[in-house]
Amino acid sequence: MEQAHSLLLNEEACSQLPEHQRAEFVFEWLRFLKKLLPATDRADVKQKQKRLVEQLTTVLTSSPGPPTRLLLAQCLALVYRVGDSLTSSLTVDRCNDIIRSKDDSPSFLPTRLAAVACLGALYEQLGRLLINSFKETTTNLLKAMRSAESQGRCEIMLCVERILRGLGVSAVSCHRDIYKAARTGLTDRSMAVRCAAAKCLLELQREAVFLWSTELDNVATLCFRALEGSNYDVRVSISKLLGTLLASALEPRQAIAPRPGSKRSSLEEVMELLSSGFLRGGAGFLRASGDMLKGTSSVSRDVRVGITQTCVVFVSILGGVWLETHFSRLLSLLMEWASHTRATQYPADAVSCRCCVSFILRATLGTLLGEKAQIAAAKEICQVISKQKRVVDASLHEGNMETRVSPADVAASQHVLVCALLELGSLVQDLSSTAAPLLQDTGIGMLDTVISVLLHPSASARLASAWCLRCIAVGMPAQVAVLLDRCVERLNALKSCPEAVAGYSAAIAALLGAVQLSPLGISHSKGKMVMTLAEDLLRSAAQNSRISIQRTQGGWLLLGALSTLGPTVMEHHLPRLLLLWKCAFPLSVKDVEMELRRGDSFTWQVTLEGRAGALCAIKSLVVHCKELLTDDVICRFVPLLSCAVALLTQLPSIIKSYGNQIKNAATVFKLRLYEILKLLQPKIYEESFGTVLKQLLNDLTGPEITACAERNLLPSLCYSQDLALLGPGLQDMDQRYIEEQLHGGGSGGGTLEYDSFTIFEKSQEVLEQFCEFVRQLKGARQQTVQIHVTAAFFCTLKSLASSRRELGPEEVQRPALSLLLGALEGSNPLLRCMAAEGLARLVQVLIDPGFTVSLTLMSFDKLKTARDAITRTGHALALGTVYRYLGGISSPQYLSACVGVLFTLSQDNTSPEVQMWALHALSTVVDLAGPLYHSHLEASFTLVLRLLLSTPHTHVEVQQSLGRCLNALITSVGPDLQGEGPGVCAVRTSCLVGCAVMQDSQDCLVQALAISCLQQLHMFAPRFVNLSSLVPSLCINLCSSYLSLRRAVVACLRQLAQREAVEVSEHAVALVKELPRRDNTQLDVTIKEVGLEGALFSLLDRESDPRLCRDIQETLVHMMSSAAESKLAHWLKLCKDVLSASADSAAAASVETQQEEDGDRYDDSSAFHAKSESSGPFNNLRWSTRVFSMECVCRIIAQCENRDSAHFNMALAQEQRLHESTDFLVLHLADLIRMAFMASTDHSDQLRLAGLQTLLVIIRKFSNVPEPEFPGHVILEQYQANVGAALRPAFHVDAPPNVTAKACQVCSAWIASGVISDLRDLRRVHQLLASSLAKVQVGRDVPSQLYNESTFTMESLAVLKAWAEVYITAVQGSRQRDSPVSHQQQQSEEAGTAGQAGAGLLKLVQTDLATLSRLWLAALQDHALLTLPPHYSSHLPSTGGSFYTAETVEQARPHYYSAWATILHATALWLNSTGFIVVDEGPANLSRPVTPTSMGQSTSLSNVKSPEDINSDRLHLILGISVEFLCSPHSGDQMENIHSCLQALQALLEVPWPRSKVGNDQALSVELLSILHRLIVTRESPSIQLAVLELVQQIICAAQEHVREKRHSAEVDDGAAEKETVPEFGEGRDTGGLVPGRSLVFGALELCLCTLVRKLPQLSPKLTGSPTGRGGQTCSLSATDCRLVTSALAILSELPSICSPEGSVSVLPTVLYLLLGVLKEAVKGSVGTESGQLVSGILQALRTLLTSPMSRAEKSRGAWTQLLQCALHTLLESWSTDKVEPGVDEVTMLTSLTIFLLYASAEVTSVEPLQTRCIQTFRASLDSKDPVVLSRSYQLLLSLFQGPAPVARPFILALGGRLVSQLEEAEKSRPQGPAELQAVQDAIRALEALVFAADETHRPQLVAVLLPILISLLLDENALASAPAASRSLHESALRDLMRIGPQHSAVLKALMASAPHMKARLEAAVKGNQESVNSKAQAPPAISKNTPSIQLKINFL
């Protein structure tokens, strides 16, 4: 195929190819030529033009296929347009000659069609250059059309359309002739010709003014005739044509020359034209008159559907502005349609007409108008409703009761009211909370108007009114309670009026049904009210026969609707409901038989209505409250069902006895019974099987069943993909609502067949009876029965397959197969589809390979012998579906046979239907065969491509099947498409050629399949799909009028956006720039302005299909993920434009900050003001689209968080912006705040929630970003007023609870962020929370509860959580300010308002703390109760808790779960601040009891609790909640909750009283440790692990205090001084044993060991000994890891102190092993760079351990001494065996050794050889060459010399001389650096300590040694001047020491001076020099101080 890519056709390569590949080669060449010609130089084209034209002409005359001829025509026209156009007339003449040819043979037809196509393309491209031959060509074409077959007529019409497009106004001379030909084409028998003629006329009307002026009536009549018997495509084309003409007539695009008597059409005239077709159709005068006389309607439904679509097109073209202006008149005219007697003679016609009018209103108002215009339209509709209601009311009150209203008036008004009310409901539901102005407009009185219709005499109008109220309730949940109260009140007042009972009960039921769609619900009291009302209606039904039926129906309707509120409501009413059901049915089956002997037709009608209602209520309970269906309740059902089944068998005799007036009631009863039986388990009514089966057989096959709505019944039973065989009528489409009217048919039994039943032992008889019924009947009745019984059996098979049960023995299989095969060969295509699916289910149920094989062989035989299309289509589909549920095709033999048969059938050109079904079956086989199909791929691709290139465009159904087949083949090849082999390249080329053929198709479904195939190709081989051609084709179809095509386009875009979002967007913009201006749509303009993403936002706003909207949103998210950072400003502006594109939103403005000079008068509400902003790419977007834009903003912020840190750093962003052309989020903070404000203050509640969420995200992400220009400030400070203004509306009294709850969350985050710097700002925000707190105190017992009680829970807990967060922040801030570090910082910084705000926050909270603390405790108590296991549910308070009611337990749980942790932390902090001192604050700040028990503060005298009890309750409440949560096995718990729990426990244990309680209760302490141990194992978060260890330290501290107190008490009480022994306390007692699971010490050991081993696995003997373990590895520890290890060691060091002496001996070896093990790792340097922090912790732990009182206790002293000696030995051994690193490691070892020597008892260190080795270690350290080690050694010796005499003496004796000699050497080698200087100074101090450690008697001798050394370190005057800095420092230090020590020992000094004159001279010289230096400094003039300016300039201007 690569050889086809040239300017001229490679004829040699082409001739060598086989015949079937030649066409593909030519097509590929033409494809390439089409792309190449526009890019080729004109001269090159001219040079080769002659040869090129010859080649193209050769292709033209070689019978090209439809796709080839289309490409050929385009290429031929391009050649003349790009090259020389002079010879084009020759080609035109040649084409005309071909068209004139007399050759009528089928082989010449493709050439003639190609010539026609070429003419169209030539004239379209060259236009007026061919004007000379135009008339001749047109005449020739129109003449040929008369004798042409359907393909020719279609092609000629399309050719003429292109000619008109090319010539424009120049073609005016032939307009009339073309019009005449197109008129004929409009009513052609071929649907494709009708479509082509409509397109031709659509192009003609651009210049032919007469079409929409003088000829408008005739064209309209012609269009009406064209709609008769039309298909979907024709209706779309005709509606587009006629709608355009009517719009042109009303709003002409060009001026019409004035003619006598002519005038511009008015809206009334245009609608009258449509009305004539709508009411009379396309019939002539005589036929219409005859219909009028006969009283029948001749208007077919397809005409009405077509006119409906025309009306939508007409209004859409005129646009939203026109509609807004003229809606009142349009509405009036549409209502005339709905109420016209011609359209409403029969009920079915009336329903169809109403649907059409409703569709027009929905398709125009719902898509063209913005929210403000929709509100205006709703007001107009309200006026229409009021007008109609007034007419009916007037007729009701005139005259007597007999003549109160004519049926015609009621009928006319009811249809108008139904249409108006349904549209009003849809508008309000779409507008949601933005419809609030409608309710507030008292002039309209919308609610009064709608409710008034509930009294209408017509049931349809009443139900429409009820539905409208339901829509209002869904859109505005706040109205549910109000409307319910109002309807109940009116119903109680008008119980004697039948219409009122029926209307208001329907309204109440509708409102109850709306509650499940509202997240806020209604109060449970409303349920009780409705239950009482329903009981009252049912009990009073028999009191007045005139309204018995209405009360009965109303009562049961209310009970059925009540069940939709769910089990939490119904469980309270179930006993009463069961009693009502019992009363509705006889007590037994015998009573049913007795009933038959009494009553009349009226009583039976009431009885049947009542029982049908009861069954409906049972069904509603089963559907909505499955949890309540206990065995007991089901047992109560069984007698009722038995009676109902018994009555079922008696219905025929009852109807026979009392007439047909009760037939409807009997049918409804039967339906309700079948519905409930279908929902229940069959075992429940097992005794009634026989009766039910007989009745079902009769209902499915009975003689009264004459019609069947198979279009409603069968599609749901067919396989979804098989429905594609049945055309676009069963596909999803925009017009589905009215298109379904065409398939309604009769309703005889069509609603009963969905009831599946299970066949047991009577299966064989039932199936045989089914087959017999089908055999006996003929004609339409046979088909009806066949559909019913086959559908019933199919449902059985499906049920058996889903439950994995068997059908039965072979006797059952035979009739089953017979039944399905009969349906497979039926004339109804839907039935055949369902039968094929039924065979697949039968094979699945039987699981018999032999049966499957025999079934396929039978189909093969049938296909070989049968010649009729019906049989062949059915069995072809069966071949494809048989293996559908068996895991696919696994037999190569079956696959080969199947492929061979289907290949043959798919090439049967005589029957397009057989081709279509065979190809669809082949696609199914490809899917099911999987890799097994690979051997057939090449042949399949060849077949599909050949058929695609040869199938006429009129056979679109075959093209659709080919598309599905190609898609399956691409999927089968899969990732292999990426290969480079010759075979793969050929397959890939075939795929691309096939897709190109389908893309050029005129059919939208074929185009959609082409896009789907390209999407598959892109998934498997993305680099071979050319985006530059694919994306433009997608964008062109983005606004297609076909839903399936739009879905395919967006699905493909979604996939492309995941990989190449930027390229896709660029290609889209490039396409729009290249488009001719004539084709520009609003979408193109949008793409040009804001890119493809902006167009997708526009499309999202217009679309109503959920699947398509979801795909659009995902596409936008993918595009944003790829490009949001690189095009940040673009995306943010796009979101801002979308958000502000609302005509009526208060936020649709540019928002500017207004700051007043007077701070006291400053108010948040003035922070923003709106300025009109009309410009922008979007207009009137809906709230849902704007909500999505805010979600996009949040996504952008989240994306930036994971990218460059400069996004959240203003200084860094500004710096990088100077060097790079990058953008950062922080630079757009003003826009983010502005958008959040706009959304937060919108009318739409959903948008307000989205805005508040965005504001919350902004606060969390930007609160810590500093402001570079104002150090010490953050960037958000400048937006304080803006945030306050955004929050304020959410705290309004009328704000919904969910909005207020979200605002509380934002409020607390704002306060806690620390941004607020001014105390006044802080007070303003605090006041918002204070107002909410007051609302919480009022409580849930308010009389007008609008929402469910759980909303009070949500709001209350949100408020309490917000206050808790604020309090936590305030306390933490206060603690930080009180810390010493913070004090220093505050003193060093200037005092500012930030400090005032921080200090003021705690004061503000403390004013409400008394109230808050009680509320917090109450909320925690509620939470504790709700977390009890289910078997404790009986312990829950019957009235509920403080913030929830008993009925809303389940709804309340999530709200408690989201808030409890923060409240727990705050409560613990409050208790910490009070020190658990109970203060009686009094109830002054609390307006209601907080909780049933008030947490121990009840004022009842009998229940007064002591402060101790109250504290105990509070402590155990917090402990219990914390322990329960931390024990939870769920790993998904939020880390914040765990942190809050741990911090709460820490806050508690900081207070002595709770610490003593925990210390006293060892079981509790052990349990806590066990939980903390599991937590540290399961959570990897370092912060959690650190918090755990801190908490363990507090628990150990509590135990220490307890043990200390016990010991002290024992000593005092028992008189320890007088007794030899004192009882021992602590773990281990007398034995020293520690019991796992009961021992606190053991638990702490486990926890610490776990922590240490995880960080230092070398400590574990098992891991160290393991050859593959981590023992040998060295792991570097982070700073956090070091903190964890240090904390664990600190805990370990404290453990012996809580043991008895014996217990301490048990635990000491482990503690020492771990401590020394960590020390060893630290000394080895294996812990990394953070070892300094760890070493200090180790040494502190060692010191704590050595100073433990247990080391000196009498009972343990000996053991401790031995163990410590062993430890010291180990330490010394590691010194000698391990390679000690120089520097800090050696120092660490020396330090630890010193701690041992100083703090262990002398018994430990004085034994040999330990003492000697210690001395040797120090002696070795004194020989070190490292001055740091020397310095530290001297410091440690200083400590030792100052230590106890037994410790110091040996070291003084052993090392004193060494010390002196080293100091004497210092004179010779003076220090050269700071380290050496420090070592000498430390040595001097050590020697000084040695001197002063000596006895008084020996001290002078030692001073006599020290003083010469100091004097020797002095320098003379000359040496001092030139000496290094270290030497001078040593000189000065030595002199100071001499002047300090000398006077203390003057005698020694004098003796020394006398004996050593040279020393005396040196000393005197040094003193003299020092004195002179001091004097010179004192006489020096003071330096002039240079004041630093207070304001620093950033630029030095000097």
From Swiss-Prot:
HEAT repeat start and end residues: 811-848, 1025-1062
Listed Pfam families: HEAT_HEATR5A (PF25468), Laa1_Sip1_HTR5 (PF20210)
Biased composition annotated in UniProt, kind: Basic and acidic residues: 1162-1172
Keyword Repeat: yes
Domain of life where this protein originates: Eukaryota
Keywords of this entry: Repeat
Segments for region (Disordered): 1149-1176, 1608-1630
A Gene Ontology biological process term: endocytosis
GO cellular component, as recorded: cytosol; endocytic vesicle
KW Repeat (keyword) present: yes
Family that this chain belongs to: Belongs to the HEATR5 family.
Name under which the protein is recorded: HEAT repeat-containing protein 5A
Organism: Danio rerio (Zebrafish)
